[in-house]
Structures are given as C-alpha cells and as structure tokens.
C-alpha cells in the first residue's frame, strides 16, 4: 500500500508539474503576443495627445496593420472623433500614429477661421531642429486642415510648434510636447555621420534606408541630413524595395507577397496581394501611367519544378489587383538557359538556377523596360513588354555573350577605353530632350561572380572583386550616355565607392549623387565632382543595407 501511495503521489506530482509548465508556456506565449502588440500600438505620452482604442481590432503583428479591413475600421474611428466635435487651431485633434504605419508620426486635424498655411518645428534634446511646411490638397492657404507630422524623435520628449500663417503674413502658434514609442528596430536614433572634404550642401529631402539587416525587426527609416531617424515605417518580413510617389499615393512592398499604397496621412488605402498566386516579389518594381505595378518576381512553381528563380516580370493591375505574367526570361533567352546550367552557391538562392538575377526595372514607356541582370553583368532593353516582348539591345562586355546563341548581335558599341559594369545594381533611366538618347546611372559593384557559368573568364574585368566585402577592391558610380540612334554607349561619369559585391544603389539628387555600398552598411552623398560631402553608417554588427534613396515628399507630406 505504501508503494502504491508513493507511486500515486509521484504520478500526481508529475501531472502538476506538467500542468504548471503548460500554464507557464501559455502565459509566456500570451505575453509574447502582448509585447508584440505593445511595440506596434502607440502610447499617448504628451500634452493633448489622443490614442485610439484598438482593443476590438485584434492587432498582434505588423501583418495585421496592413489589412485594408483593419485600416478601414481605424479610419471610421478617426472620422467619428472628427464629427463628434469641432476642432480649432487652439484645440486641435492630435492622434498618436493612428494608422500604425509610422512609429513616431502624429495626426493633426482642425479648422481655422481664416485661410492659412501650416508649418511646424520639432525640437528634442540633443538633436537638430526639424522644420517643414505641410502640404494641403485644399490649397496653399486653406481653412480645413488634416496632416501627418513627420520628424519626431523616438523614445524622447519632442516639443512641437505649429505655425498658422494667413495670406497677410500674420502668424499664430501652438506648442505642445509628445514622447513617441521607442523605435521597433533600433536602439539608436542617429546613424554615425562622417563629414567629407566637399563643402557642397547636401541635397534636400529624407533618405529612405531600406532593408537594414542589423535591425531587430524589418522597417524602412526616413533619415535626415544629420543622420537622425525621423520616421519608422514597419514592414512584415521583407524590404520595401523602393518608395514610389504618384497621384497622392506612396507605393511600397511590405512583404514578398504584398505591396500597399499609403496616403499622406499614413492610411493603407490599397493592398495588392500575391498570396493566391505562384509569384513572389524580389528586388524592384515600377508604376506605369495607368497605376499598374510592373514588378520583378520569382515563379514559385518554376522554382519547385525547374529550380530557377528571379527571372520573371509580372503586372499587378492597379484597379483590380489581378496578377499576370508579362515575361519569363527563359522564353526570351532560351540559348542562355542551355548554356548557363550552374547552381547558385553564395546567396539565399543557394541550390537554384539564378540565370538572370534581374535586380532593377525602369519603365521608359508603359511597354518598354530597362532591366539590370546582375548574373550576366548586362543591362537589357525590352520593348512590347505587354504584348510580344522583344530584346532591343544589351550593354555589357562582349565576352559575356561570346558563343551564346546569336545574342552578341544585340550588343551596343562601347565608345572609349573603360571596363564595362560587373554585377551592377540600381540601373536608373534619365531621359534627355533628344529621342533615343538618355543616361543610365548605376552602382557598378565590380564583382566577378557568375555561378551559372563557372567556366566564364573574367579577363576583361581587371581588378574585379569576389563575394566578400573587402578594402582591396572598389565599386563605382557609373553614368552612361546611351545613344540608340548610333547604337553606342559611353562612360561619362565615374565615382569610386567602397566595395560591395551584392545589393547597393545610386541616385542623382539635386546634382549630387546618393550612394549605398550595401555590404559595408554605409551610404553617402557626393558632389558633382565626386568628392564626398557626408557619409552615414549603421551601428549594427550585420553589414547589410539593401538600398537607400532620397525623397522630398513634396505635395505629399510637405509643400514645395
């Protein structure tokens, strides 16, 4: 009996331990969900600041934010607040990040008795002052005012001064304070800033820092010229690729199967989903004149059946959201696919055929595109994209296409003595007034990597680097003048940059050049002569910034 009693007590104890462990697990899991939710939802920490009640929306993750049904319900809550009471300049409605798409953002709503334009200044201890004039779609001077404030510093008190100026120049001000949530992805509010030798003024705007892998969570940061993070846009599990502003909408990717448009107030007004298709986004997209999204993609069915990736162009209808294939590169470059049979060994596409690796797309017209193919170190122009795609030309060293079908016939003639681009990224089209004549600028990675053809000779690419970031090599900003009328291209500008074998971007902005040497986690701005004005560096241990572009956000957040 004593033995049976001992066994019973042991069994009972085991059950209690098991139940206790289960309860602890459930509590920890619930706590984790709560913590996740709390990092997304704002706190009304400031004078006259209101926070919406989200308890009925079941928001637990970033993916919940980017559901249009959720956003519609949030908009209804805001509308109810606005209609229940009249808000004046003295007693305005101020909401903390109501749409949850900018960690440090504020929503303002009020009316003025006179038509006024609204400007604001943000001050926070130890940081530079941020000032802007707000864009009002009702006109420069208006009586009805609804805005999103960009520029607050996360996790510390900000003093915000709003100024209303009427058409006679008379001003009225209102000042209040607010402490936003801390940043979701970073512990620091400022990047490391290093001054260069150039005395040229930095270009206007905010740097959109896209795909910083040193962060705890995926976000896109808007960074000012002093390196301070002025906005944090959360994304789900992917880079936003780029920001495209058109028709009072801001397009960005939030996952590899979802793009959205935001309005100037931060509301998600449309979501484009690829979840029910066999496509995944990668690298880049453009928006045509009809509001359709033309994107680079991977076909997941072909990835499974043929082990190939990153060689599709798709169209997402801007109205219906319907997804259709525009181009499979294998159909256009069949002879290349017969030759390039090697398997990717270096990137997240290990084990797959990455024959093209298209990494940027530019629309010259709605049915004409310029594609950057990293794997072939080639820039391709394709016409009749939406009907019967046709290769117009290639820009590359002739050695890449020697003995591969008849594609050498597509090569433009190189004018001058320089080494053609290798492993390039961020190819950007800049038109001129002459038909068939334009510029192409790019980040020339100068990386000698081609897993699909391991026997390829890089003899025509002296001093090219390998797959590891190293001070022994250099990348470059390249700017070509392309003349389709003469079938030629020439290098008209070059700036030496820190070496980055993968990723990276460039952009001409206000006659300066913005560059991102992605695998050094450094972006910078250079003057027209190629002298460094200033560089910015993230402080995380992982050195990887996908792309950096600079935007003014005029006629969106800010007035011209």
Where are these regions (language model features)?
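Solvent-exposed serine/threonine-rich low-complexity stretches and specific carbohydrate-binding patches
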Residues: 128-140
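Hydrophobic membrane-insertion alpha-helices, especially the h-region
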Residues: 11-22
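N-terminal Sec-pathway targeting helices
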Residues: 1-13
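Sec-dependent signal peptide cleavage junction
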Residues: 20-39
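Histidine-/acidic-rich catalytic cores in large beta-rich domains
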Residues: 44-122, 143-146, 150-560
